[in-house]
A protein has these predicted regions:
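Conserved glycine-rich cofactor-binding loop
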Residues: 87-88
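Short, small/polar-rich loop/turn modules that mediate ligand/substrate recognition or access, typified
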Residues: 243, 248, 303-305
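Residue(s) in the substrate-gating loop at a strand-loop-helix junction
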Residues: 211
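Alpha-helical segment proximal to the catalytic Tyr-Lys
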Residues: 196, 240-241, 301
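Active-site helix of classical SDR
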Residues: 191, 227, 235
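C-terminal substrate-recognition "lid" of short-chain dehydrogenase/reductases
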Residues: 188, 199, 203, 281-310, ...
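Substrate-binding pocket helix/loop in short-chain dehydrogenase/reductase
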Residues: 167-168, 175-180, 262, 269, ...
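Catalytic Tyr-X3-Lys loop
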Residues: 162, 169-188, 203, 207, ...
Length: 316
């Protein structure tokens, strides 16, 4: 078993002596609350008394409220999304976003059964299945359970991952292999299981969650950066291969996201991280989830093989 919680550091200086700063691991969020828009009433104004034989003036009316912008995508009907690492963090935020949009939702979790149960209570009808994505046998059992319970998988969000802060010279062969097994082979396993059905239907969406550290480099996490960079390569190559079958493959690369994984960081730590970020704040898991939801929809049907950074300008 592995521990999903680690503390990471990064150095963003472009010049001069580098100093190491602590950075958080990538996944993890707070629940987004979407309030319904307030209802606006149209009221008739009272009609003033008019002189005899003089027609009363027309009552004044308040202007009609502006119409809400409508998506060009058709309503979501009978679509299922499978999210690995969906019990908390970015995965849980994605589960909430897809659920609110009308998807059937299945989440895979590794060891945190309590968090998975809490998500099921919050979102009635969500399926939670235990799965170690690094194990092909575990993926096959979990994927079969999801298909039997909810039907075909229309959208796969490969989000499960681990991180570790360690000097390159101190990384053991076992730690190196485990990082690749979870962060890269895990995506390979789930994508191979999802693709046959998508190819038969000539439709499907595959979304991978990499990291800005797969686009650039971070200190003391060479194995993590290597695995996440490999995930970007896997996404692009697979996109080219399956596009003729009506399947699009896209990648989201989050930066420093404010989630429960940052609970050990002090207010000073968070302030320093925000100062390093060009937009002046940390990202939220809900922001990443909204992008995943958009990329899964019909409005994003012309997009494939691309990497979308959600990093506040840290990587440009």
């Amino acid at each position: 078993m592995y521990n999903d919680e680690f503390e990471l550091t990064f150095d963003l200086a472009d010049a001069g002596p580098k100093k190491e700063q602590r950075r958080p691991t990538l996944p993890e969020p707070e629940e987004a609350v979407v309030a319904a828009p307030p209802v606006q009433e149209t009221r008739e104004m009272p009609v003033s008394a008019a002189p005899e034989n003089t027609p009363a003036s027309e009552p004044e009316r308040e202007p009609e409220p502006a119409a809400e912008p409508q998506s060009t995508a058709p309503a979501v009907k009978d679509r299922t999304v499978l999210i690995s690492g969906g019990d908390r963090g970015i995965g849980a935020a994605a589960a909430r976003a897809f659920y609110a949009a009308g998807y059937r939702v299945a989440v895979f979790y590794h060891t945190n059964a309590e968090a998975a149960a809490a998500l099921q209570k919050e979102l009635p009808g969500v399926l939670a299945v235990q799965c170690d994505v690094a194990s092909r046998a575990s993926c096959e059992l979990a994927f079969r359970a999801a298909e039997q319970a909810l039907g075909r998988v229309d959208v796969l969000v490969s989000n499960a991952g681990i991180a570790q802060q360690k000097l390159f010279t101190d990384i053991t062969p076992e730690e190196w292999q485990r990082m690749l097994d979870v962060n890269l082979t895990g995506a390979f396993n789930l994508c191979q299981l999802a693709l046959p059905g998508m190819i038969r239907r000539k439709a499907g969406r595959i979304l991978t969650v990499s990291s800005m550290w797969g686009q650039t480099v971070g200190s003391c996490d060479v194995h993590y950066s290597a695995a996440k960079a490999g995930l970007i390569g896997l996404t692009k190559a697979r996109a080219q291969e399956v596009c003729p079958s009506g399947i699009t493959v896209k990648c989201v690369a989050p930066g420093v996201i404010d989630t429960d994984m940052m609970a050990s960081f002090t207010a000073e730590d968070n302030a320093a991280l925000a100062e390093e970020t060009p937009v002046g704040r940390l990202g939220t898991a809900e922001e990443v989830a909204k992008l995943l939801l958009y990329l899964a929809g019909e409005d994003a049907g012309y997009i494939t093989g691309q990497v979308f950074g959600v990093n506040g300008g840290l990587v440009i």
